[in-house]
Structures are given as structure tokens and as C-alpha cells.
Amino acid sequence: MANPKVVLAYSGGLDTSVAIKWLQEQGYDVVACCLDVGEGKDLEFVKEKALKVGAVKSYMIDAKEEFANEYALIALQAHALYEGKYPLISALSRPLISKKLVEIAELEGAVAVAHGCTGKGNDQVRFEVSIQALNPNLKVIAPVREWKWSREEEIEYAKQHDIPIPIDLDSPFSIDQNLWGRSNECGILEDPWAAPPEEAYELTVALEHTPNEPDIIEIGFEQGIPKTINGKAYSLAELILQLNALAGKHGVGRIDHVENRLVGIKSREVYECPGAMTLIKAHKELEDLTLVKEVAHFKPIIEQKIAEVIYNGLWFSPLKDALVAFLKETQKNVTGVVRVKLFKGHAIVEGRKSPFSLYDEKLATYTAEDEFDHQAAVGFISLFGLPTKVYSIVNGEKKVSV
């Protein structure tokens, strides 16, 4: 009788490599699944490594464009920053990885899926809630959470089973990267008072070493979707990667954040998001030009909730779908070009234009070209201030001196 299959989210690192052998010992045939969401790894090597370690099959899926268009784009249009700082790098990729795990599990007739998360982080929640939403009949296995080994015990297990040990194992950092950015934790970063060492960064240049001349770029948007840089068209994934390089060269997008994790602890992390932060800033400026006041003032409430929902692993939820439906409605006229200066850690918007601009220079100007009806202000002020005036009249004699 054939062994039941389990589909493992495989990264090529020590944890998931050991997990292949461990799952085999539990009686499973392991199907490895590795997604390319822009992490910059040699994923063909990772695919082959899974087979060498013992997987019966290994999938390598190029999901960069799907990640960009279906996940990162929503974060961009929502200006999604958890606690006002974190651009949801890992939180955005987990639902897509979960989706692919479920798709392969159904294709392979697997009874379970597995991930390499510990019992301490947010990702275990994001994976398992997403998988439950997509296929409640699949069992979810978390080997690292179950085996409770120390790092030394895990390395010894790997040696005993001839599992290749990654050459970067001595690195003190825990890193996750995709198109939208790079997150880094552990090691010296666990001390919130310690300055991050320069080796903690990879996508961005230290301010001391950035160019002394700025780069001026123009980003073109169509209905809220970035399409061009300096007039040249790119796919969304390519555009984000281009901006990572352009803005990263100038040190844009470094974030040092102590955040409140979903599991109840605080965590200090360092993020690099040069492309994401540049796009969010440019997109917000174009919205300021094209959205009516009421929508512009209400949208940040939706944005904050979307960030929380994504961070908490509720991507496949009715609430997220409803929030995104509102978000998409706001993007119909967010078309135009934004000029950005990249210099010494800053993405500075210096100009914006749109065929749907609600800015009327003849109404805004203080020159002789002014077309604003100044006399209309008299009646407006009278009506606008009427509630305050009435309150003052009614309560004027009741005021108490302090």
C-alpha cells in the first residue's frame, strides 16, 4: 500500500530539509513545493536539493507576476503599513504559498500539507488559517513546532541523515525576502537598543555610501496600477524589481520596527522595502490629486483595517474581500504620472499630473487669474459656523471660570 502524500512548503534551508526526512519517518511520501516570489534564490538548485534529500517529487513555481498583481498590488493601493511602518512583506506571500500548496495537494491526492514555521511566529497562523479556508479537509503538519529540537540537535540529525547543511547556517539572522522587500530578525537585532549592523542589509545602500547626485524618475499609473518608469513599460513584477534597484541605491526604504506580533509578543525586525515605499508614496500623491475629499478622508480607515487583516493571516476571508472591493472602486481615476527624486534615503515627490486631476489652478491661484467666488465664502462661513455659534449662545451664561 502506498504511503500517504504530504506537500511541504520547501525553502532549501535546514529546517525544511530536515522536515523532509522527519516526515518520511512519520510514514509520508513528501512532495516539495518551492515558490519564486522574488526572493533572489537559485530555485532550480533548491528544487534539485529537495529530491536529493528525499522528496518523491519537487515543484518549482514561478509566481512573481501572480504575487505582484494579486497580492502586492493590493498592499500598494491600500498603502498597507502594519502599525504605520511594516509593508507586510512576509504576510503578503504566505497566502499565495498556501494557495499553491493546496493546489498541488489536490493535484497529487495528498492528505496533508506541511510548513517549516516555529510555534512562536505569525507565519504559522497565516499558513494554517489560509489552508483551512481553502481546503478544510487537508491536515496541516508543522514539523519544526512538533519536534521541539534545539538547533544543535537539528544539525546532528541532518548529519546523521546526510542532509546538506547550508553554508550560511552560521548567520545570526533570519531572513525572508520577496519582490515587496526583505525582512530580517534574530541575532543582535533582538536587542532593540542595538544599532543594526550593515551586514543586516542587502537591498539598500548605507546613507554614507549613497550617490551625491539624485535620480529623478517618473512613475506612470493606470487606474492605480504602476505601469511605467520614465516612459518605459514593465510588467508589475519587473517594475517593482527595477525600483528596488533604483531606490535601494539611494538608501530608500530602510525600516527599523518593534512590532506587536499576532501571537502576543513584541518583535524587533529590520525591513528593506525600497520599491514598495517609493511606490506607496507616489501612489498616495496621485490619489491626493484625483480622489474627492470624502473618499480621500475615509480611505485611510479602510487602509488600516486591510493592513491588520493581511497581517493577521485573514487573506481568504469575507472581510478582506469586502475591504478590497471598496479599495478597487477608489482606483478608477488614479491615472497619471508622478515625478520622484531619489536621494539620501528619501523618495521625494516633486510633481504629479493626471487627466482626472481635481486640482483647478484657476480656483487655487492667488493671481489675477483667480476664478474663485470670494463672496461665496461669507454665506459658507455663516452656515459652517452656525452650530458653534448656537452652542456658544446657549451656553455662554453657563460658563464657569477656572
Curated annotation (Swiss-Prot):
It is found in: Cytoplasm. ATP binds at A9, Y10, S11, G12, G13, L14, D15, T16, S17, G116. L-citrulline binds at Y86, N122, R126, S174, S183, E259, Y271. Signal peptide: none annotated. GO terms for cellular component: cytoplasm. GO terms for biological process: argininosuccinate metabolic process; L-arginine biosynthetic process; urea cycle. Its EC number is 6.3.4.5. GO terms for molecular function: argininosuccinate synthase activity; ATP binding. It catalyses: L-citrulline + L-aspartate + ATP = 2-(N(omega)-L-arginino)succinate + AMP + diphosphate + H(+). The keyword Iron does not apply. Keywords: Amino-acid biosynthesis, Arginine biosynthesis, ATP-binding, Cytoplasm, Ligase, Nucleotide-binding. L-aspartate binds at T118, N122, D123. Pathway: Amino-acid biosynthesis; L-arginine biosynthesis; L-arginine from L-ornithine and carbamoyl phosphate: step 2/3. Homotetramer. NCBIfam families: argG, PRK00509.1. Belongs to the argininosuccinate synthase family. Type 1 subfamily. This is Argininosuccinate synthase. It comes from Anoxybacillus flavithermus (strain DSM 21510 / WK1). The lineage of its organism: Bacteria, Bacillati, Bacillota, Bacilli, Bacillales. The gene is argG.
